[in-house]
Amino acid sequence: MKQQPKVSVLISFYNLAPYVDQTMQSVLAQKTDFPVEVLCADDGSDDGTIEILRAWEQKYPDTVRVFVMDRTPGANYEANERIRRMNAIRGRLFYEARGEYVCYLDGDDFYTDDRKLQKQAAVLDADTAHRYVACGHNGCYYWQSTGKTQPIEKPLRACSLTAKEYWSFLYVHTNAMMFRNVGRQGIDPYASGVQIIDNMLTFQFLPYGGVYYLPDCMFHYRQIEGSTYHRRSVYQNYILNALMLYQQKVICKGFFASGLVRTLFEYSQLFAARKDPRLTAQAQTYLGNIRTYHAGRLRRIVNYNNENVLARLWCEVENPVWFFITKVCRHFIWKPKVRALLEEARQKQEQTA
């Protein structure tokens, strides 16, 4: 008889055959005092990924389950369709998860601490008041070509943050998060229909609690030349991050001020680059391929050279006012609060040392 798992690890794959074994081994090697299930979803790979996953499923039939999406042979889906399929994969895994806690993992990344799941579950178990919906930690970039590593975020002491404080300042890669399985309480974090990419996955859970942060680097985020992330320019990544400000309103309007603070840097860079014809053209082309309502608004913001005088005047007025307000909020409201929280965490550490 299968035991009820405490943690469900949800892994998504597409044409990642060279990395499957390392990823699966890092998860199955976890040392815990509770049962763990590993759910794998593949987006119709044609490079042998599915066969490798089936072998792991046969080897660990009580732990590993594999789901495969249908895919038209040779199909080359556009960006929106690829994101939709990724949403479907992650949603399917979430609905299948039986654990009290869930962790997401990309199929080419891997855990580096065999106590990772135990450490995070211990934090959430101790939080009997359910103040935290997630426990996150630091990770390391891992360059496939050289084997070099580098922490994703600057070292930070262990601390607890409310949902708004987290969304204003902190970034934790989704692979480093352990979430409470809110689906067991009948809550569907995917019901909003928002595209679930990177940070937006974490944001789906934030309305249900804060985040406890551990400073340990416990996973490697593989950097592969030619990947989707590396094919995008820095400017295009600014645009995608800025679009999250509007997407998050669909989930919870109460986080909009935090979102303004979070995306301040991206908007300041977009605003500063508007007078560069090359960057403006790049932005318009890139945004033209993003079929969302909010992409239209962002197109107006970055299009400084619009022939419409009123549109240019609106850009000149709207952006500086918005920039000033968010900078004031960041400096006088959020930064002091976070400093106080970090100082409180430091004092507690000194008292327990």
Model-derived features with residue positions:
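A conserved acidic beta->alpha catalytic loop
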Residues: D42-E51, R71-G74, D106
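Conserved donor NDP-sugar-binding/catalytic core segment of glycosyltransferases
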Residues: F110, R115-Q150
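Short aromatic/hydrophobic "clamp" motif used to bind/position activated sugar donors
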Residues: V102
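Catalytic core of nucleotide-sugar-dependent glycosyltransferases
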Residues: E165, Y221-E225, H230-A257, L279-Y293
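Short, well-formed alpha-helical segments that are part of the catalytic scaffolds
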Residues: L16-A29
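Glycine-rich, basic loop-to-helix element that forms the pyrophosphate-binding segment
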Residues: D70-A97
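Membrane-interface aromatic/basic loop that binds lipid-linked glycans or pyrophosphate carriers
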Residues: D33, A272-A353
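Conserved nucleotide-sugar donor-binding catalytic segment
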Residues: Y95, H137-N138, P155-Q236
